Amino acid sequence: MTCTLRLTVAALVLLGICHLSRPVAAYQKCARYWYCWLPYDIERDRYDDGYRLCCYCRNAWTPWQCREDEQFERLRCGSRYYTLCCYTEDDNGNGNGNGNGYGNGNGNGNGNNYLKYLFGGNGNGNGEFWEEYIDERYDK
């Protein structure tokens, strides 16, 4: 009995360590969109200097359901997979995005602008693109 108890305790400890050591994704609801902060966000954000972007997403079955300002994504949150249409709030002008050291937050977006990289759009360094976009989208 003692041996079985020891094995059970050891197994539970190992399971606990494995559970705690796996990457944890945080789910939050933002307006009518869901977004998920992955442990290292989306693969394309690997140059974002550790700043986690807010990626606003909605469920979609196919890329054709996404609007022109959205990107079709297949994201993993924990053990679940989602197919989504997503856009990001970050225009990468202030160096907190994937910035690569360009732009100081005051000038125009550059060739490595995050939105331009994703969607061919142009923002400027102080985030006006998304401020105007979000105002236009939600304040009507």
UniProtKB/Swiss-Prot annotation:
Subunit structure: Heterooligomer; disulfide-linked. Pif97, Pif80, N16 and other proteins form a complex.
Top-rank taxon, per record: Eukaryota
Key words of the record: Disulfide bond, Extracellular matrix, Secreted, Signal
Cellular-component GO terms for this entry: extracellular region
Protein name: Perlin matrix protein
UniProt record similarity statement: Belongs to the N16 matrix protein family.
Localisation per UniProt entry: Secreted, Extracellular space, Extracellular matrix
Role description: May be specifically involved in the formation of the nacreous layer.
Signal peptide stretch: 1-26
Tissue expression profile of the protein: Component of conchiolin, the organic matrix of nacre. Only expressed in the dorsal region of the mantle.
